[in-house]
Amino acid sequence: MINVITGRQVDNLQNEIIDQAVKSYYQDKRHDVFIIVPNHIKFTTEVRALSKLSVLTNKKQVAVNKLHILSFSRLAWYFLRDEAIKLPQILDDAASVMLLEQIVKDHQDELKLFQNQTQVTSGALRQMYEAILSVRAGNIELDNIDEKKLNEETSYKIHDLRIIYDEFIERLSEKFATKDEMQLLLNQFLAKSNNLSTMEFYFSDFSHFSLQELTSVRLISKKAKNTTLAFKTKIGKIDNNAEPGDYDYVVQRTIGQLEHFWQNQQLDYQTQEYPLTQTSPSSLLNGVWTKTSGFDERLSKFLQPVKADSRYAEAYFVARTIYQQVALNNYRYQDFLVLAPNLSEYETYLTPILRQNQIPFFNDLQREMKYHPLVVAVENLQQIFKRGFQTDNVIALMKTQLFIPDWYKNSARYQNDVDLLENFVLAHGIKGKLWTKSLKSFVDADVIALDKSEKEVEDLDRLRDYFIDALTKFFEQLDKEEDPQAGVTVFWNFLIKNRVAKRLESWRKEANDTGDLQLAQQPEQVWSTLTDLLKDYLLVANKFSVDQFFDLLISGFSEANFSQIPSTLDAVNISELGMVQGQGYKQVFIIGATSTNLPQIEKIPGFFSSENLEQLNEGNEANGYLEDQQKINNLDQNYQFGNALSLASDKIYISYPVINTANEQLEPSIFYKQLLKLTRADEFAQHDLPQNNGEVLTFITNPEASLGYLTYLKNKAATDVDSLLKMTEEKIGEVAKNVLEGSSFKNIPQDLSPELAQQLYGDRIETSVSQLETYYQNSFEYFLNYGLHLKKRFENELDVIQAGNYYHETFDYLVKRIKEKKLNFADLTEEKLGELLIEVREELKEKGRYRQLLNDPFNKYLFHKLDQTTANVAHYWHSNVNKTTFRPQYSELSFGKNQKVSGLSYSWKDDNNKKKIVDLRGKMDRVDLAQVNDRVLGEVIDYKSSAKKFDLGLFANGISMQMISYLEVLKNNNKFFAQGKDLDVLGAFYQNITSSLERLSSEKMILSNYQIKDLAKESTKKLMYNGILIADEEMLDLIEPGMEKDRAVSDLYTSVKRKVNGYISWPQNQSFTPDQLDLLLAYNSYLIKNAGNEILSGKIELDPYSYGQQTSLTYSDFKDIFFFDAMLKENNYHKIKSIDKKTLLTLIREKLDLDGEE
């Protein structure tokens, strides 16, 4: 007998099916009764069936062996387990795709789509694999398709698929099968079986069957004693005239397909409409959603739309509502269902919030295996084989903690050594073949503290050697194998020898001991998946290939998920919208209802497009057809959403966030908007934080979760939550106390006491100018850097700093090499200068830190470009050497304590009349001297890798003191530089180290007559000196004799030229008279003493400077410590304004309390 029960989406047809099946089984326990449901709800259906049987038999415990609750896949295993047939080895998808790849390569010359492709992508292969499964499921005979009726695209696809399909099926038939084989075998069994006549089958919660499932239902209904199917339609009736686009088209189509079969087979069947029950809120909502009934006032209370500030607010609304309903209204956790179109978007919100509120839940979102340490290890083994010993892969392999050497007694010590080793290799730029060298060969670079710790380096070297030796031997052995069995054996032995299996077992035991059953299952499941993948590989591989072997493992693991079991039956269920759900929930939450998520329209392309499938199916439906799964899903969106709306008996919540994690605005789904209009329900606004006392109850759950919100409200004006806070403190006193204290925290660093400052810095500060500039940039950063000596992890990379160091050292070595060889720079030929530069580079690149960087081919290229730049600058110097009387005399000249050149020293008395001192040390990139007419003249050159000028605003605020300090060092050390004579200083200048050319499109390059200027000449202007220039015409003429000429323009100093009237035109804000220079020097001393005084008195402020678009935070290493937020009242930038020379000099006189005008 065949029975079809139809009802509306709100009708509990599953309950009816279970009732009938259990009663039938109870009346005659000798015959088999099967309840077939989607695999997703098999467990809950089984629990409900046994509960009904328990009530029927009046027994608390029941045992059955003829009542079966199965999915289609389990039904296949059930029937075939005792059959006298050899069940095939089911291939994993990854193995099937690998087999397909072999076939495509073998027939590539015959194919039209893949003929000219050097490599077929895994995505294309997977699409073809799914197409092959569709062809098998649809009983399509490819040879019978008339390609003349197809367009070119479809014809090409059928041509290629026919070639590949035949070979694929032939290879399968030899020894294994794809994942759909069990369904095909089930149908073969059902077609031949004569044992179904005593069996009863009940189908529930299906709206659509796959082609093979449909075949199974047809065969069962033809042969079984009783077949009962339940379907939910729009109005609970069968509609034989349903068309695509109709609300319940998909389910009506399914019923129609079955009816058509029964009628053709002349089988009797009867239909039964589920009786209308008393009107419920869910039926009212279903009525307005399906447009079968009108508005009812009860709807506005049954449906609650929620507009949330964020996904976090959405998740908290769910948790808070569940918590309060369980606490106040006698609900159980199992009464709640949470659905989302894309549950992964809420993975980092829902789980921690529910746990914080101590709400038990079961999340049926599959946990992917690809993040397990064993899978991570396999991925990095492949990368090491393909790319060599790249540091990120080697360290990642170590960090899986699967390969711990036996001399480590615990994993904590091992992890500490791995961390230290990572610091060491990053600091020394170790990658590739450098991993094979002893760590001792790198310590001469002396870049981190570990370099000085011989014992620690030895321990780390032992760890390095263990891994590199094991991996080298493993890959050598693996790479020479050609037999698949031998290759797999090498891999397996590698894992066993390195105790990976034992490590996984220890993790399983630890999780078991702590009661985490979910976690305890993972080691066993991931190991079992690995063994299955290895078996699959052996089935399909003809010849061992390391790449293919790892590809199969990684692809297989990427598709694998951990099976899950609920830790308790009384738990909130979390699932994805569109998946079949059991009924019986009281309240349902639909979250994430945004325009991009609902409806869930699929757009992922397959091998066959919808247009291709329409052509192929035209006129062929009687013999078989290819199902357009994407089209069916898209047509079923309204119906599936209606299913979700029908799941709750008491209340439905639908919500959406107004922004995503990138702070992008989100719009509500069209479904959300329709429900808002249909139900006339008031939209509830769920904020991230309570706005006032009136909202406090919308955030209250348990003490731990509520504390933060209560504390926030306490700090708001006109709110009173003291009584609630008092209750919270009674439950979690210490935690509440800490949070409340933290809520009054102001992001203002506290000053040090003078005593503590003295312990950190001493009475005498020995520092450099650049360090003191840091104090003025942000005094808190100075404290972290030079008080606590915090440093970010050093990495030996060819970054801007390293490039700058290389520039400096190149010019330093060049100047010293010229002096050592007693050469006259002016007499050098271009060729000789080039030879000297080559000598310098070769010597530099033997230094530890540069030698290590040059192991990277890309770094070699970068060094080549750096060498081109230094050569450009050196040849520029050489071309101008005869235009000036200056000659480079000193390079990288250090000054300060115990140096030939004295540093700068400043002293003062503090408030306690105690003497304090600041000693300045440093290094000048280059000092040029000239002796002309018994006068000694000097200038300082500072190399910069980008264009820079002396900025008066920055100097006024202590952020650019370096050049003025250099000038003072020169003036104070005339005995050293001028052998006791007076030293006349021309200035201190920046030298831009660049080889860049001026853009031809630049306005600077176009003359008034629209001719283009000389490119080389204009580009060399970028190399001219720019900085602090002493406006002394007599001295300038001595230094650059060419400036004596009428209307001369300086070839050396920016913006210096002789005017028509014979006077020199000086740069407006970068030139100073000797008297003005004295003022600058005096102010510089003031700034240094002021900084020293504040440092030693312990003054600390979080006061980063802001100047135009730049701030001192831009390149700071300590932003995560500062937590600087300009939106906070207590956090403010120290804003600097641009000033001119006149304003600066006036400011200096005011600060120094001096009289007089310029």
Swiss-Prot record:
Q: What class of enzyme is it?
A: hydrolase
UniProt EC number: 3.1.-.-
What are this entry's molecular-function GO terms? 5'-3' exonuclease activity; ATP binding; double-stranded DNA binding; helicase activity; hydrolase activity, acting on acid anhydrides
Task: Tell me which cofactor or cofactors this protein depends on.
Answer: Mg(2+)
Role: The heterodimer acts as both an ATP-dependent DNA helicase and an ATP-dependent, dual-direction single-stranded exonuclease. Recognizes the chi site generating a DNA molecule suitable for the initiation of homologous recombination. This subunit has 5' -> 3' nuclease activity but not helicase activity.
Describe the protein's quaternary organization and the partners it interacts with. Answer: Heterodimer of AddA and RexB.
Q: What is this protein called?
A: ATP-dependent helicase/deoxyribonuclease subunit B
Task: Identify the species of origin.
Answer: Lactobacillus johnsonii (strain CNCM I-12250 / La1 / NCC 533)
Q: Which gene encodes it?
A: rexB
